[in-house]
């Protein structure tokens, strides 16, 4: 991450050797579409023809993990700082605070 002294909460999206792409607001991993139902709450207020996630393509290097934040328009994640190492993961999320409709323990 860009600030080594800060902790970030991100989703691991892809592993080494996998190709991650976003095309027209759809996530693809190795060419296969992947549904991100957890983003529905964020996307519902977007204007038609507006994308929540800009298009990109990334091949995860050896030993790397590709991570994305849920608030895609402003998230600092692998699109900004590249792949991360597994060793940089320090914990797992246990509780959801946002959006309010989803508050509770992670299932």
Task: Describe the predicted segments one by one.
Residues 1-107:
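Soluble "head" domains of membrane/secretory-pathway proteins
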